[in-house]
Amino acid sequence: MMLERTTAAIGPLDEQAMATAADLQSRLTKPAGSLGVLEELSVRLAGLAGVCPPPLPEPAAVAVFAGDHGVHAQGVTPWPQEVTGQMIGNFLAGGAVVNAFARQTGATVTVVDVGVAAPPTSIETAPPESATASGARPRLVEANIRRGTRDLTVTAALTRDEARAAVETGIRVADELVDAGAAILLTGDMGIGNTTPAAALIAVFAEADPATVTGRGTGVDDPTHQRKIEVVRAALRRHEPDPADPLGVLAAVGGLEHAALAGLILGAAAQRVPVLLDGVIADSAALAAAAFAPSATGAMVAGHRSVEPGATVALRRLGLTPLVDLGLRLGEGTGALLALPVVAGAVRVLHEVATFDSAGVAQK
């Protein structure tokens, strides 16, 4: 089956390529280690690609997975559920923050409806001004598995078959984007209420207390935040999800966009293409992906540190260092897009910077 074939194809980083990259970094015209995290990142990307220098992360593709959540009925957010579908229309019209940042970086935007409760509204042909520098306009992939998840405090959010379908949708999207030429994939998400299942997923996979991983999402007040924590606790008590069964965890307390993002990450890792994580939704999905295939972490790059507390817990569990910390909590892929030039810079150093010998520069 697709999921099993994909996880079987995910292997470890190429140690020889990493050693070559580390050696090259030590001979470039700069003090050893002076580029900090960027040096470590360039070495890891060489290991992922199996060659030094690794390919430049161009062109880039953002995949924004959208879904709704039955737990919305528990009052975990003041935002109405129909905003999810309305925002899809905004993405396709080029009017969201993700579109502005994508135009700045030249990344394409693909919006994937995996579980929106109501058909997306205001979907029209994207205007010319929504296009990136390459001329690509935002596009919609209709892959709705069900019209929103079930309320995870009452029953499992998804069946195992639905969770598998979402994961495999993400794998297919990764395959399609890479086949179309993408050299790096960026995670995006849209779903009113989706930080609640994200907190539940992180609590399970990181073995953390819900109070330490449940944040304020869109900025809820204290009573709503406390209710949200209790909702996560109640869901975990009801389902007792087993972190050794990632498909079961996604079915019990996940969301369709979380499962699809896990699939996107697995698909990228199987193709040995880096995937740049956005915020807490992507971080929770990355934990699920790592539970399916531990070596998938080799393809993951943490774009930024979300202010959602679960993001820090998840990244620590994954062993990933966020590239930027700007106090973001929007989602959509915005933080990943802001970090994209940092990733490109890390790789470009290996391609373009002279060595001490080639430049005729003396060493200490």
From Swiss-Prot:
InterPro entries: Nict_dMeBzImd_PRibTrfase (IPR003200), Nict_dMeBzImd_PRibTrfase_bact (IPR017846), Nict_dMeBzImd_PRibTrfase_N (IPR023195), Nict_dMeBzImd_PRibTrfase_sf (IPR036087). Pfam families: DBI_PRT (PF02277). The active site is at 332 (proton acceptor). Transmembrane segments: none annotated. Catalyzes the synthesis of alpha-ribazole-5'-phosphate from nicotinate mononucleotide (NAMN) and 5,6-dimethylbenzimidazole (DMB). Its EC number is 2.4.2.21. This is Nicotinate-nucleotide--dimethylbenzimidazole phosphoribosyltransferase. It comes from the Bacteria. GO terms for biological process: cobalamin biosynthetic process. HAMAP family: CobT. Belongs to the CobT family. SUPFAM superfamilies: Nicotinate mononucleotide:5,6-dimethylbenzimidazole phosphoribosyltransferase (CobT). It catalyses: 5,6-dimethylbenzimidazole + nicotinate beta-D-ribonucleotide = alpha-ribazole 5'-phosphate + nicotinate + H(+). Keywords: Cobalamin biosynthesis, Glycosyltransferase, Transferase. Gene3D superfamilies: 1.10.1610.10, 3.40.50.10210. One of its GO terms (molecular function) is nicotinate-nucleotide-dimethylbenzimidazole phosphoribosyltransferase activity. Pathway: Nucleoside biosynthesis; alpha-ribazole biosynthesis; alpha-ribazole from 5,6-dimethylbenzimidazole: step 1/2.
